[in-house]
Amino acid sequence: MNSQHHFIGLSEQQVADSRAKYGINVLTPPPTTPLWKQFLEKFRDPLIIILLIAGVLSVAISIYEYIGLHQGAEVFFEPVGIFVAIFLATGLSFYFETQADKEFCVLNQVNDDESVEVIRSGNHTQIAKRDVVVGDIVRIGIGCEIPADGELLVATQLSVDESTLTGEPLCHKTTDPALFDLKATYPSNRVLRGTKVMEGHALMQVTAVGDATENGKVYKAAQIDNSVKTPLSEQLDWLGLWVSRLSCSIGVAVVVARIVMYLAQYDFCFANVDTLAFIAYILQTLMIAMTLVVVSVPEGLPMAVTLSLAYSMRRMLKTNNLVRKMHACETMGATTVICTDKTGTLTQNRMSVEEACFYRGGEDCKSIVDANKILLDSSDFSNEIKEGIAVNSTASLDLSNPAAPSVLGNPTEGALLLWLHAKGVDYEALREEVKVVEELPFTTDRKYMATVVESALMPGKRMLYVKGAPEIVYDLCASTDGVPLKAAVDAQLKLYQQRAMRTLGFACQEIGDEKVIVDGTIHVDKLRFLGITAIADPVRNEVPESIGECLNAGICVKIVTGDTAETAKEIGRQVGLWTDKDTDRNIISGPEFAALTDAQLDALVMDIKIIARARPMDKKRLVEALQRKNQVVAVTGDGTNDAPALKAAHVGLSMGDGTSVAKEASDITIIDNSFKSICKAVMWGRSLYLNIQRFLLFQLTVNVTACMLVLCGALMGTEAPLTVTQMLWINLIMDTFAAMALASLPPSEAVMNDRPRDRRAFIINRPMLAEIVGVGGFFFALLVALLYIFEHADIQQLTDIVRVQIGENSTVTPYELTLLFTIFVMTHFFYLFNARAFATHRSALHLKGCKGLVFISTLIFVTQVCMVELPGVQRFFNVVSLKPLDWLIIIVGSSFVLWMRELWSLLRNKK
């Protein structure tokens, strides 16, 4: 792989020319359904169809009243109002769904912004995938997604998963024509956009970008996966069906009750019934019943969920959480266990060589000062260390800013290159001058890597360089000449690991022409151990607080790391996970973990805090064991080998700098790799669930009131207490507007003080049910009492109720019906604020960050006043103007809903 440095790559001018000629590396999305078709799709909704039927019935009744009864043109205001309500409901629903679609499309954009390592003007640098052009030289390594079509220049044991294009899960790629697979779909030296590197590394020269790639010719846009039915979505489907059936039953009851009441006026003597009037009455009754069904059915629930998800996904992206699968938003809020990597997630992933211990002919070098001296001399021992670090590596440095070089590739290997660079050793020159004979890439199972080269610093020598986990590398060594006994090396390692430093061991051997790398292992008999470097990776400043927040929220955190037990324990101690009370039962090594039977693991799994020296499949087995304990598991991963665990977990969390294979297997990508962002994802998941509960609380409370009021009105034999257009306005408030207001509520950090919810628990819990029945019942009793008073007394202004005298039945006047309608709306207007404060200890008037709620509530209030007071609007809703005193009494009286809740909350908080 070292021969890569003979390539210069494109200049800036050549990049511009190539982009102008061949275009950018972005796939054109497939054509979408035209907006007008998407809008018309809304009219296929069963509830909209019911409303359209109600509108047609209203038109028929209005025509009868206008022609048959010679009434004025104002009879057409109601059908016009119905159709306006229909278009308003469909229009708002269409608008917010298109907005949500735009939010979900962010996945494609982020995918195009992923970093790619290229060589330009002789320098290694990182660019966005969208900026790759034809002619670019791109470095590809294990786990990465190939950014464009290209031809291999150099390849080391390269295997590519082409299943997305050819169905072949593993294709071996090479630049050696003698090894070409002549039966392969594509030439063995050609790699294709969208396929993934499963093993090895290579350099490729781009030959096609964007739509010109093979992938571009069969491209289907990546989408947010919303196909998974979560417990919440299943509950909401069942709830919607149950409410729909109940609403239809109430609708039938209203029809029967109104017909019976109508015929009772004529002692059920059909001869006395005016047929046309009776038909008109039945049509009106059917219209009221259908409207009641529309009002009762929670058709706003899907929109509330969609809006909540879209809003949450957009805001989560701002906190470095890219949601790839929609169900993960909800599931993250129910997480009970987080299995996390150490490097980069708990630590800063800013590695630097802090200590070194090299062994030269019995001379111990146990300080970084001594190690620096060795690097600067010209002995063979020094040359072995310098050359071994420089050539036995897949990392590079971006030296475009010499004052602040940055690492490209593995951060641990990069720390070694930075160490050489800081001491004036030109690692690039060393790579240029050697001839690489063969390589053995690093794997998590092997835990070491090896490279055979024709040495540049020691001419005439062929050298094998090995680097990896010190204990593994030491055990490979046959020569102990000048090297302390293993016990002494282990003691040195333990000192480093107790300081939470990552260690690497080095070895080398001069060899002949024989092949020493066979079947993925090295076969030598005189490998000599050179020494150890200790690399520091400080804990992220915010992690201890975030770990504490998770523990306080009832979430267990488990560290799964490839580091040693001592290193892992020290990191655990620094982040607040490992305490003095913990014992050997709380930590286990990868081999010990693998040796456990399932029964033994099930008995131990909840106590395990750290798995050290973990192997890839250990993480997946840990996830499965936790799931057997009914835990909701989130797991982090950044490598290709993490994909099985990411898929097995309830929520897979890939890292922003992880491989494409890991990202594709995950549900959420943590862009900044930080554990704090994982903690934020939990908070967003819990808040999303709470917002949906708030919407249900508000809507079902309004449902109970509206349904019972209309049914009771029918049984009392009165005129319908609410007209069709009034019910549609109420429906608009509690469905569309409430969905908009409550779905956009910001997350509350207070949710992190609660224990995780039971993922299978029904979303309507006991406190919600009690409030729905209690508040809905209170509103119903209040409105029925008012309806009874209006039916048996002549109310000229609202203050008359204080001294009212109940008399015989009388017709409810338009003024009284307007009072009833306005009181209904205003009580629920104030209850909207109560719903916002549900399950919190905050005041309902704590509106910081609730811009959407404030805007929507203001809109509801202003619109209600306008429809009652503006002459042009009154006719649509069959209302009349109210007196200023009436408004004052209604507003003050209705607000008692709010103040009673505030008083109760105050008393509860004091207790």
Q: Residue ranges of each PLM-predicted region?
A:
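Alpha-helical transmembrane segments and their membrane-interface junctions
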Residues: 778-793, 864-875
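Core segments of transmembrane alpha-helices
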Residues: 702-706, 774-783
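Conserved cytosolic headpiece of P-type ATPases
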Residues: 1-756, 761-764, 821, 838-911
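Alpha-helix capping/termination and helix-coil
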Residues: 630, 682, 686, 781-793, ...
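Helix-coil boundary and interhelical linker segments in multi-pass alpha-helical membrane proteins
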Residues: 714-723, 789-815
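Generic alpha-helical transmembrane segments
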Residues: 734, 815-832
